[in-house]
A protein has these predicted regions:
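Metallocofactor- and cofactor-centric catalytic cores in central/energy metabolism, strongly enriched
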Residues: 4-6, 21-22, 26-29, 33, ...
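N-terminal amphipathic/basic leader segments beginning at the initiator methionine
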Residues: 1-13
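Conformationally flexible catalytic loops at phosphate/diphosphate-handling active centers
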Residues: 150-225
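Short, solvent-exposed amphipathic alpha-helical segments in soluble enzyme
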Residues: 39-41, 86-89, 114-117, 144-146, ...
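Single conserved hydrophobic/aromatic residue that forms the stacking wall/gate
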Residues: 305-313
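Glycine-rich beta-alpha junction loops
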Residues: 104-105, 159-163, 236-238, 283
Length: 313
């Protein structure tokens, strides 16, 4: 059924349809409505935690017990939850686990303008980044598939404009899921130094496999344009700004997976245009990765680091 939904409500709907059973979050704009909307579904146990670290640990406990779980917070809350995040990257999960984090470009309700994508790279966990409500719903469901397929928590990065904008979504029924049996595995789940040393290579191999998956994943796509003098790499809200300003004039590489990035796809796209441009909010995250790959491009030398990209475009 087609419905008009806020981005945050669409995330909640995606969690519901994917069979999420436990939600533990700490409130903070622009993430709060995800948990508020989840609380409307009787099939999901929802709670507000004392802080983001506790929320993440509750969700992790539910995952270990075999339930699909979610924890939500705003960008500064991920600082509080960083301790368990980095260790959970090593342990992996049992039931799928999704971590929703909402950035606030423009600081509409926040004390800083940090970019959560750096946490995905540092913690070596995948991150999905929707650009509208339809993708918010779809990516929430996809995040669970990735989590269980690759044995990892998955970050779902929202931002103010996507979280609080409305667009059309297609809803379906909830897919009920049996709990995945817990199997005691001290070497996997108890991160004493001896165990952690053996888990680190597993994490690196997982990142390599995720990068391969990203090369052909439908969340990353090239949209052709008539004029190949300029090619634009973009993501999240910035994709909407680019399409509003440029329409179909220039080819666009729209990245729905913020980490790991599809290097082969990026190189092929760069080779197909005369001038490569990256349009993104907050830090030059994609830009820095492209430059590290040896690609020449225009990025934050043309657009500011601060605020959102709408006015600058």
């Amino acid at each position: 059924m087609k419905q008009l939904m806020l981005g945050n409500a669409a995330v909640a709907r995606g969690l519901y349809e994917a069979g999420c059973g436990v939600v533990s979050s700490y409130p903070g704009t622009p993430s709060t409505e995800i948990t508020e909307e989840c609380a409307k579904y009787d099939e999901i146990y929802c709670e507000w935690a004392p802080n983001e670290k506790v929320a993440m640990e509750v969700a992790f406990g539910a995952s270990l017990a075999g339930k699909r779980s979610f924890c939500g917070m705003k960008h500064v809350g991920l600082n509080v939850a960083a301790d368990p995040l980095f260790t959970m990257s090593y342990t992996g999960v049992n039931g799928g686990m999704v971590i929703g984090v909402a950035d606030d470009a423009g600081m509409h309700s926040s004390q800083n303008e940090q970019d959560s994508r750096h946490y995905a790279r540092a913690a070596k966990v995948p991150m999905l980044e929707p650009s509208d409500s339809a993708e918010a719903l779809a990516f929430a469901k996809l995040a669970y598939e990735l989590s269980e397929q690759f044995d990892t928590p998955v970050l779902l990065k929202m931002c103010t404009r996507v979280a609080h904008s409305q667009s059309i979504v297609d809803t379906t029924e909830r897919a009920e899921r049996e709990m995945i049996p817990y199997e005691k595995n001290i070497a996997k789940y108890v991160m004493m130094p001896g165990n952690a040393k053996r888990r680190h290579p597993v994490v690196e191999e997982r990142t390599r496999k995720l990068a391969q998956w990203a090369e052909t994943a439908p969340v990353n796509r090239v949209e052709e344009g008539a004029d190949h003098k300029i090619g634009i790499i973009t993501s999240s809200t910035s994709y909407q700004y680019v399409k509003e300003v440029c329409g179909d004039r220039f080819p666009v590489l729209k990245l729905g997976m913020a980490w790991p990035l599809p290097e082969g796809l990026i190189r092929d796209f760069a080779a197909s245009v005369d001038l490569l441009t990256v349009v993104e909010e907050l830090d030059g995250f994609i830009e820095a990765h492209c430059r590290a790959m040896g690609l020449a491009l225009a990025g934050k030398d043309c657009l500011l680091y601060t605020s959102d990209a709408a006015d600058e475009l």
